[in-house]
Amino acid sequence: MTDFNSESRSSFFSNSSALVYLVILLFFTSSFAGVSAAPIEKEGNSTPYVILDEQPIGTSSQYSINGSGLNSENPDWGAANTQMSRQSPRYPSPDGNNLTFWDRTDVPNPREVSNAVCHESIEHPDSRNLSDYVWLWGQFATHEMDHTTTQDGRTHDQLQPDTAHIPVHENDTWMGFPGGLYMRFFRSVIVNGSDNPDPLIQREHPNTITSWLDGSVVYGSDDARGDWLREYNGGRMKISDYPEGDLLPQANYANDPTTPGMSFAGFNFTDSFVAGDGRANEHVALLAMHILFVREHNRLADEIAERNPGWSDEEIFQYARHINIGLIQTITYYEFLPSLGIDLEPYLEYNSSINPTISNEFSVVAFRMGHSQIGSAMLRMDGDRNPIEQGHLTLREGFFDVTPITEEGGIGPILRGLAYNIEPENDIYYSDDLRNQMFGPPGSGGLDLCAIDIQRGRDHGIPDFNTVRESYGLERYSNWSDITSDIEVQEKLNSTYPDIDSVDALIGMFAEDHVENSALGETMHHIIKDQFTRLRDGDRLHFESDNSEIYELRSEIENTTLADIILRNTEIEHIQCDVFYAEQELDQMDCTHLNKEISNNIEPNSSDISMIFVLTLFFVLTLVLVVMLKVTKTENNINLEEEE
């Protein structure tokens, strides 16, 4: 016979109460945790960002489409179609004529320099294990910040465009033809009036897109393009629906004359996609990145619309756009630049005295660093990191061809391959696909990117390497060994240029020994660091600035990686957490998609509180009822035993 005394009964109630409190505690902690560490099924994940009590972004807190107005005292700083800045003095023309300053007679022509210095027989993988995402993000960021169009008759009023075609001798090993030929080169468009032959008037160039990291590569830099890209329904951007997933909107020039212009070379323009930047179709890897961030915008827009059913299309669009811009900024500053070995000073606050305008030295020289980091192979891999059925691509097979995305598996295989492959070392050498066969075979439109990069620097009046260094406060070099410890490169420079003060700035920067723990030489490192510091500190709406209406989200945005965006917008299930470093072991690709909850630290609205209260009360009452029933049943059993 059981002796169920008052002490035992008290203990029972005590334990039951503890159980109730424990369950309630677990309920609250699971409901309001900031970040869940447990991976979830991607198909079941519809809300990676949960932003409570959102408010629409006011007009004054939005990035304007053309980049103007961020600085109230200097509203044109960073705006599209404004003059690029210049840190170093212009290269002096021998005859004093500004129209021919590019025609240097004291050094070989750019193709000769390319053949003598930039030819590479064997690719050397990056010594710091950087992946192909480094050069790709560099290209994506370049198209986000600067675009100087050329006088090719399509983008300039001149019927007779200003040219500086590059001679190719008939004995050229790769491009030679009997009688020789010229590689086409159109000079950059100039700011109105700067083509005056008066030597006192300098020839300057406009940046036709915004300087800011403001998502212009996704949203455009002018009203016509920006409006065309929008769906004007639920804050979304236009897409094309393919079996491979949502892709960019298709160009349809025949039926829609308002379709924004895109760059075409060697393929039917009706096959192209339309993006915020006109160069999106240049390569399938670049196109994949464009698609990724349009998907991210629409994902954000859908979730913002679901949480805020009363918001207008414009309010949803601008909020999603602002977060997407913040993601581009954080990937650039907290993943891309550190992968190059560039560590900026900690962000303090917006500084209205800083001019962020893109400089000539950055645009046409230093930030072309990625051109030597592009290899000849374009890997495409399945979920097990094996080649897909259609196989890998060569780099040149990816130029202006969208079929690898539209017909051969979408962007997933490309994004996996980029994370797997180690990019070439940043050095003086260019891949053969870029140096002899860019956009086509030799004699059939094929170009030499190294020669074009050199000629573009001369076209923009960039002075010699030592003068550029001096302009940025760096010491001039006296000997070839000061530039590089590589004896072979020293000999190439010595045999190509008459003296150390004649070296093209681009070649000098590529030849430099790297800064310790960096992928860059000193000059390139210094110029890139300077430009990105000015872009950040001179941006009133930078996501870390307290002027930004997403300021309260800064820590969550800062902790978002490119891997996160890939995982939540593609079929990819596993990838390394830092995709800027290559990983070739499948078991190390352990960055799975987490259910990240972003809160701006504002209290939930009244409807949220009411719902939480009702659910909690129901939960507690249910538990109390269960406990009471258990106690009653136990007491009945005791009474029966006592009667026996």
Q: What are these model-predicted stretches?
A:
Residues 38-299, 303, 322, 326-451, ...:
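N-terminal accessory/cap region of cofactor-dependent oxidoreductases and related radical enzymes
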Residues 312:
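Acidic, glycine-enriched active-site microenvironments
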Residues 484-488, 641-643:
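A glycine-rich phosphate-binding loop feature that marks nucleotide/adenosyl-phosphate handling sites
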Residues 315-319:
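Short, charged, amphipathic alpha-helical segments
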Residues 306-308:
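Metallocofactor- and cofactor-centric catalytic cores in central/energy metabolism, strongly enriched
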Residues 1-39, 603-644:
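Secretory targeting signatures
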Residues 459, 471-474, 482-483:
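Folded extracytoplasmic luminal domains of secretory or organellar precursors
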